[in-house]
């Protein structure tokens, strides 16, 4: 049994725990510890009840310093210094680093020094980690010696499989991306101070442009795409699910039917369970709690002059990403154990 700890129990940390139980992967992995500075009562409550994803199917109880889920007892820790975490004593195989704060090798190696064998970061990281993985595209690069790995971002996981498919079939010359992302907890409920002046404004009242490094994230996964993409991002007043407007110029001449056929075939084949395809007239909330990284909306595919293709992609930026955290961590463990 793989022994897991979660460091940082916010939106992604809680989604990882719930996804573990809902996906059936609990038979392979067990969460034995959560390190979170919040009060235990709040930890239990937000595990049981969630505005976005609904009630957790399992009853959650607090007994002493443990969260009980059925027969599973998960130790709740409140340690701000990761070097002092009891990972050696708890025989932790892998830590999900989900604070959004520890984003480079040196800071994440605190978990290794504390006794964990591997760390998977739930965020884009600095370039000095052992690898940045988009599961389904490059997880085969994982090696036994890799100890600190990034799971990239939700939007990178959404867009890279699609770019990979298009490039393999038609060749991608260049592209431009607009991410239409649900509001996040680094924004304000009502106007308040923030270093980013746009993020001083109420999240529920505006479409808010924010910085994004998505184009650079694509390059890290697909190095041959260096300097071929640029991206912008806006936050919109919804609490979950993200849309990506992707425009690419292809080397080959195509039509809408050809593009959609190739993407649907990939969704049913190599990327089954990771990439999806729909031709139904759906809206963003229809993709809430969808475990896939990306869903192509075939009704919105457009082709101009044979080589300029516009696509609309959907993803649950919480749930899909949490499921890829599970997949990537299992691949890391498999690589380590040979």
Swiss-Prot record:
Xref: Pfam families: Gp_dh_C, Gp_dh_N
Annotated site residue numbers, Activates thiol group during catalysis: 181
Binding site for substrate: 153-155, 199, 212-213, 235
UniProt xrefs under SMART domains: Gp_dh_N
CDD domains from the UniProt entry: GAPDH_C_E4PDH (cd23937), GAPDH_N_E4PDH (cd17892)
Cellular component per GO, a single term: cytoplasm
Similarity comment text for this entry: Belongs to the glyceraldehyde-3-phosphate dehydrogenase family. Epd subfamily.
Function: Catalyzes the NAD-dependent conversion of D-erythrose 4-phosphate to 4-phosphoerythronate.
Protein name: D-erythrose-4-phosphate dehydrogenase
Annotated organism of origin: Shewanella baltica (strain OS223)
